[in-house]
Amino acid sequence: MSKVLAIVTGASKGFGKAIAQEIVKCNPNKNQLIDLVLFARSLDGLKSTKESIETISTNAKVIDLQSLDMSNIPDVELKFKSVLENIKWEEYSKICFFNNHGTLYHLGRIEDFSDFKNIQKDNDTNTTSFVVTTSLLVKKLKELGSQYSSEVTIVNSSSLCAIKAFPTWSLYCSSRAYRDMFFQALSLEYKLNDKFKVLNYSLGVLDTDMQSQVREECSEDDKSFYVGLKNDGKLINPNRSASICSNLVYSHKFETGSHLDYYDLDK
């Protein structure tokens, strides 16, 4: 029986860890084997994700763990390309790539920006490495030739910030919009291939370390709102959002290039 391959970036915590778990849990074919390739900065975090996956199903196997700083573009290109070269693609009938990694950036008014070197580093993490990893994957799939007919789904971890601007969130919003539009263009380049689909999945407001960072760094005007979300239990469990996304990926029944939001799907 052909296997599923799931590649996940930012897999050491938060939504990345959750999607690695849920893509295993949500497979409608419980007897199908699933191989996972996981990337993140923290190797310890990746090992924790690997251990959690192996307790979920004996059919799931983490075949590669890669500690990788996504702001180091030459290293991203070298390591990601090497990993792709070592995958036995002929074993898989379904390929899932969750391009999930990213940072919050600095929250603040544009007139107050000063650390432009760090902004450039965050841009490389959030956008340049996103382009590199996506491009290398589709290039590899093209190299496999017409005989390769697996179902492919590439998912961008998106946000409401990709389609709506918020004050003091200019850097994060613009990076999310960039990623969404990049994937929309990718979907058009492959529109004639109904087995190749691209999804911008808006995760919802998750109860993660990034949300803790938001509460610490947001403006005083916004702080009560974000603290209230936490105190009132309105933050979403990452695994709940990841299960919605996983079911979408397995169904393959969505319009390629679309932006779909957790809040519209969890009904």
Curated annotation (Swiss-Prot):
Top-tier EC class: oxidoreductase
Catalytic activity from the UniProt record: L-erythro-7,8-dihydrobiopterin + NADP(+) = L-sepiapterin + NADPH + H(+); (6R)-L-erythro-5,6,7,8-tetrahydrobiopterin + 2 NADP(+) = 6-pyruvoyl-5,6,7,8-tetrahydropterin + 2 NADPH + 2 H(+)
Record EC number: 1.1.1.153
Thermal activity characteristics from the UniProt entry: Optimum temperature is 30 degrees Celsius.
Alphabetically ordered keywords of this record: Cytoplasm, NADP, Oxidoreductase
Record-linked InterPro entries: Biopterin_syn/organic_redct, NAD(P)-bd_dom_sf, SDR_fam, Sepiapterin_red
Transport is among the record's keywords: no
Regulation: Inhibited by N-acetylserotonin and to a lesser extent by melatonin.
Location of the protein in the cell: Cytoplasm
Pfam families per UniProt: adh_short
GO cellular component, one term: cytoplasm
GO terms of biological process kind: pteridine-containing compound biosynthetic process; response to Gram-negative bacterium; response to oxidative stress; tetrahydrobiopterin biosynthetic process
This protein's record includes keyword Translocase: no
SUPFAM superfamilies the record matches: NAD(P)-binding Rossmann-fold domains
Annotated binding of substrate, by residue: S159, L160, Y172, G204, D261
pH profile: Optimum pH is 5.5.
Chain residues that bind NADP(+): 10-16, 41-42, 69-70, 176, 206-211
NCBIfam families assigned to the protein according to its UniProt record, in alphabetical order: sepiapter_red
Biological role: Catalyzes the production of D-threo-tetrahydrobiopterin (tetrahydrodictyopterin or DH4), also known as dictyopterin, and in a much smaller amount that of it's stereoisomer L-erythro-tetrahydrobiopterin ((6R)-L-erythro-5,6,7,8-tetrahydrobiopterin or BH4). Prefers 1-oxo-2-D-hydroxypropyl-tetrahydropterin to 6-pyruvoyltetrahydropterin (6-pyruvoyl-5,6,7,8-tetrahydropterin) as a substrate, thereby maintaining dominant production of DH4 over BH4 in sufficient supply of an aldose reductase-like enzyme. DH4 represents more than 95% of the total tetrahydrobiopterin production.
Xref: PANTHER family: SEPIAPTERIN REDUCTASE
Protein name, per record: Sepiapterin reductase
Gene source species: Dictyostelium discoideum
Lineage of origin: Eukaryota, Amoebozoa, Evosea, Eumycetozoa, Dictyostelia
